[in-house]
């Protein structure tokens, strides 16, 4: 099973997937290829994930992000997450091991937002944001999925802090 195959080890975190958000370039390419036929888009996305073990569009190279619930945390994970945390990943799905268990059956293939069930694995170098209980998945996707900006801000701030300098961040 996907759960057994994706047991968290060492510095990994296993996440129960609730929703994928395909990046705009990937979705547009698939939509155009299949002339808006949602069933064909859904079948291709499911096929990409099944064959590659991640959502990495073979034409655009891009993926997206996901929202899920932490199922298991490896004993050496540096991510600061706990089982039960609702999270959004801030690294591309093109870099995230992923198994889908529902065939994306609840998705009509006509938008970037994909209801899904499955399992993903985050590594020690992954970036994930714990989501507040009062933040809807839809709003979280809109706020968090801005071309990797949250991950870039985190990295830049850490570089400044590591050098003993106070960063200035404008939001």
Regions found by a protein language model. Name each.
Residues 5-21, 31-93:
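Glycine-rich beta-strand-centered segment in the early N-terminal region that forms part
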Residues 13, 169-170:
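Conserved beta-strand elements of the Class I
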Residues 52-53, 64-67, 76, 86-166:
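NAD(P)H dinucleotide-binding glycine-rich loop of Rossmann-like/cofactor-binding domains
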């Amino acid at each position: 099973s996907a759960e057994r195959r994706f047991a968290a080890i060492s510095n990994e975190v296993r996440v129960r997937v609730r929703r994928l958000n395909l990046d705009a370039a990937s979705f547009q390419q698939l939509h155009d290829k299949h002339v808006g036929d949602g069933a064909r888009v859904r079948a291709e996305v499911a096929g990409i994930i099944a064959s590659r073990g991640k959502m990495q569009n073979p034409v655009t190279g891009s993926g997206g992000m996901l929202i899920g619930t932490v199922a298991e945390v490896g004993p050496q994970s540096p991510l600061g997450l706990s089982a039960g945390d609702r999270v959004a990943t801030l690294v591309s799905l093109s870099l995230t091991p992923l198994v889908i268990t529902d065939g994306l059956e609840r998705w009509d293939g006509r938008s970037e937002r994909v209801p899904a069930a499955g399992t993903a694995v985050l590594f020690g170098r992954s970036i994930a944001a714990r989501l507040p209980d009062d933040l809807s998945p839809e709003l979280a996707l809109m706020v968090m999925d801005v071309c990797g900006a949250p991950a870039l801000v985190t990295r830049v701030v850490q570089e400044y802090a590591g050098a003993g300098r106070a960063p200035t961040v404008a939001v």
